Structure formats: structure tokens, C-alpha cells
């Protein structure tokens, strides 16, 4: 994409500068829209944190700088025990459906497909998000909603549903009873691409080689990335959102292929647009051409959270990656504890895993995947039947003698 995206970004920044929330942020940073002449200049714009974004959204409509008379839909998203609104204008919804239609074509959908959506349709956005894009695409849509697996299974089979939109775990539950007409499965709401062997597990439940489409979105930005029928990773929807990957500590861009925090900017959004929004999600972006026509790709989706980074053996390490990795190993319950120590002046890493009925091959594969995905060599991996309650991360390097 390169500098060709710059005119679009500049126009969006000019619009964003008319919003009080962003104008005050940019004025404090000493940056004006006319200062953005290159993509390097764009990185001088201030980041937007989830805390400040949500704080503004929670204000009443009369004092909320993101609310205007052009807003036509208000969904909600949870924040702790509270909710905050998600605003859309008609133009926002139309563009969202338009860019999603391209990804549906890339997924191999046809207008003749009958689709069933099992996500919620009330306050939250997921169900309506899929309903709207599928209708705009021209497919047939059944709004099943969540739960009630017996009724969902019956409707899917009675009406020859060919496309299922579901959490992967719910899809496996339905498939265990038999879903012979499904040819494409859209998964979301749970880690998938980042979990070793999950796709194979799902296909095994269906009993055949169905197409599986994974997506990454967040309530404030839908869509962000989606895989295609070639399953080469999750492609950034780059005609909707501009994605950066930065060092979580310095905020500086990382090199292509390096891990970092995903930062998002809407290209056209009118209501509550994001400007350099720090997602807190750890990922890698690779630029590789795919037969579907897109290139900016998250090869494994989201692989962890950036707010818990530690430096170990000279490597930046995010412990939450361990939990994601363990989901790909059936012998592990998912509970773990990683302990950092110092021995003879160097870092020593112990990993305790709760699990049972494992083989030496299982352990060897786990060691390989951990080293490959985290770049950290664990000195000891100890598997126990029951892990005592306690923190998942224990850093004893500053409390123990060398």
C-alpha cells in the first residue's frame, strides 16, 4: 500500500480534527492535519488509548463529542460491569457492508448460499454485523442467535444451510450431531488461527474439508481482518482500516514480521472514528501476496496481549502466548504458571502446566511450538495433574540471589 494511502489518511485526519476530543489531543501534541505530508509524519499523531476513548463514549449524548444527529445505530459493548455505546451513521453501515462483501467473495460465498448466524442480536453488534453484510452481499440469512443447539441443528439441516457463522466451539458441538450441508464456516469470538491444530479439530468434527474463515474485529472497529478461502492468514481489510504494528514500550514502528501492538485508524468512519488506537493486542503483520488479491496479513491472528510484556534472555516475551499455545494440546487443561529466576547470573525459566495423559512426543512438540512462537527457550517444563492456585506469572529475578 505504501504512500498511496496517504491522501485518504490526510482527508480522514482533517475530518477527525473537527471532533473536539481529537482536536484537543492533536493540539496538545502540536500536530495539525496540514503537517501530515508522509507516512512518517502520520506517526507523529498521538495514540488513542482504550481508556480515554471509552471514557468519552460513556458521556451523555449532550456532552459526548462522538455523538451527532447523523448517528442512526447505537450498539453497546461491555466495559467491566458497565456498557459503552458504539455509534454508526448510515454511511458507516453502508461502507462496512460494502467492504465485507469483498471479503465474502474472497471466502467463496455465493448469493445462492443460505447462511445461519448464531451470534447475539440484542445490544451487542456481532449478529447484526454479519446479518447486514450477508444481506448486502445478496445471500439468504437466518438469524438463529446464540444457544438452543437442538433447534439450531434442526433449522440448519431442515433448510440446507450451507454457511454457518458461529463460535468454533459451538460449531463443533453442532457438527458432532451431523451437519452435511455446511461448506463454509465463519468462526469468531474465540481464539482460532493462533491455536495450533484447532482447524484440524473442527474439520474432524465436520468429517470433511470445509472452508473455515477466521476474523478479527473489535466492537469499535468492524471489520479489521478476515481470512479467505485460500487460508493464508487473516488479511487486513485495508480499504476500511489502516493498521500499524508498534513496539508496546517505545511506541515506535517495528520491522515487518516482528511482533508488536496492533494500532488502528479508520479510513472513512464518521461516528466515533479511531485514530492510532492502541488495541493492546499482540500480533505480527506480513506483506505477502495472496490469490484473493490482498497482501497485508496477520498470519496467526492475535497471539497475546501487550500489557504484560517481560524481557527474558534478551527477548521480549508475552506470557499470555502460553495460554493460546496450550489450547492446541489436548492433554493440557490450559492452566499454567511461568516462573522467572536467575541462576549463575542468567535468566532461568520454569513452566508449570496442568495436564495428564501425555506422551514424550506431546512434550517435544510443545517445546518446539513454545520455542518457535515465543522465541524463548524454557529451561524446565513441568507437567502436574493439579496446579495450585496462584499467579500465572512469577518473576523472582529481583528477589532471589544469583
What residue ranges belong to the model's regions?
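Conserved AMP-binding/adenylate-forming
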Residues: 194, 198-289
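Active-site phosphate/ATP/adenylate-binding loop shared across adenylate-forming ligases
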Residues: 49-213, 221, 225-227, 232-233, ...
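Short, surface-exposed charged micro-motifs
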Residues: 14, 242, 282, 337-341, ...
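AMP-binding/adenylate-forming catalytic core of the ANL superfamily
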Residues: 164, 268-374, 378
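Nucleotide 5′-phosphate-binding alpha/beta core
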Residues: 1-98, 102-106, 110, 345-352, ...
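Conserved beta-strand termini and adjacent loop/short-helix elements that scaffold enzyme active sites
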Residues: 144, 215-217, 246, 341, ...
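Short, solvent-exposed loop/turn motifs
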Residues: 82-83, 253, 278, 316
Amino acid at each position: 500500500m505504501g504512500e498511496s494511502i496517504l491522501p485518504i489518511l490526510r482527508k480522514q485526519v482533517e475530518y477527525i480534527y473537527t471532533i473536539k476530543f481529537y482536536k484537543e489531543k492533536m493540539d496538545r501534541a502540536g500536530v495539525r492535519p496540514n503537517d501530515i505530508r508522509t507516512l512518517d509524519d502520520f506517526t507523529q499523531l498521538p495514540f488513542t488509548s482504550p481508556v480515554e476513548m471509552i471514557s468519552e463514549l460513556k458521556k451523555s449524548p449532550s456532552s459526548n463529542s462522538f455523538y451527532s444527529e447523523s448517528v442512526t445505530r447505537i450498539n453497546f459493548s461491555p466495559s467491566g460491569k458497565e456498557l459503552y455505546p458504539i455509534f454508526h451513521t448510515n454511511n458507516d453501515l453502508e461502507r462496512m457492508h460494502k467492504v465485507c462483501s469483498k471479503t465474502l467473495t474472497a471466502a467463496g460465498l455465493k448469493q445462492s448460499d443460505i447462511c445461519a448466524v448464531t451470534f447475539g442480536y440484542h445490544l451487542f453488534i456481532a449478529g447484526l454485523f454479519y446479518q447486514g453484510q450477508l444481506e448486502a452481499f445478496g445471500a439468504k440469512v437466518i438469524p438463529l442467535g446464540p444457544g438452543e443447539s437442538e433447534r439450531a441443528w434442526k433449522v440448519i439441516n431442515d433448510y440446507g444451510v450451507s454457511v454457518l457463522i458461529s463460535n468454533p466451539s459451538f460449531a463443533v458441538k453442532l457438527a458432532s450431531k451431523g451437519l452435511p450441508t455446511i461448506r463454509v464456516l465463519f468462526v469468531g469470538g474465540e481464539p482460532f488461527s493462533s491455536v495450533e491444530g484447532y482447524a484440524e479439530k473442527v474439520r474432524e468434527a465436520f468429517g470433511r474439508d470445509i472452508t473455515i474463515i477466521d476474523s478479527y474485529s473489535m466492537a469499535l472497529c468492524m471489520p479489521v481482518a478476515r481470512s479467505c478461502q485460500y487460508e493464508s492468514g487473516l488479511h487486513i481489510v485495508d480499504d476500511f482500516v489502516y493498521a500499524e504494528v508498534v513496539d508496546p514500550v517505545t511506541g515506535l514502528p517495528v520491522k515487518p514480521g516482528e511482533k508488536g501492538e496492533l494500532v488502528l485508524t479508520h479510513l472513512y468512519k464518521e461516528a466515533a472514528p479511531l485514530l492510532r488506537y492502541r488495541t493492546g493486542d499482540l500480533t505480527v503483520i506480513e506483506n505477502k501476496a495472496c490469490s484473493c488479491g490482498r497482501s497485508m496479513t496477520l498470519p496467526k491472528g492475535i497471539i497475546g496481549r501487550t500489557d504484560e510484556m517481560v524481557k527474558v534472555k534478551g527477548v521480549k516475551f508475552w506470557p499470555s502466548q502460553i495460554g493460546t499455545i496450550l489450547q492446541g494440546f489436548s492433554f493440557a487443561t490450559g492452566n499454567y504458571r511461568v516462573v522467572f529466576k536467575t541462576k549463575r547470573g542468567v535468566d532461568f525459566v520454569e513452566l508449570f502446566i496442568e495436564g495428564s495423559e501425555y506422551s514424550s512426543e506431546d512434550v517435544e512438540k510443545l517445546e518446539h511450538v513454545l520455542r518457535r512462537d515465543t522465541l524463548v527457550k524454557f529451561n524446565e517444563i513441568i507437567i502436574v495433574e493439579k496446579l495450585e492456585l496462584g499467579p500465572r506469572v512469577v518473576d523472582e529475578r529481583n528477589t532471589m540471589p544469583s
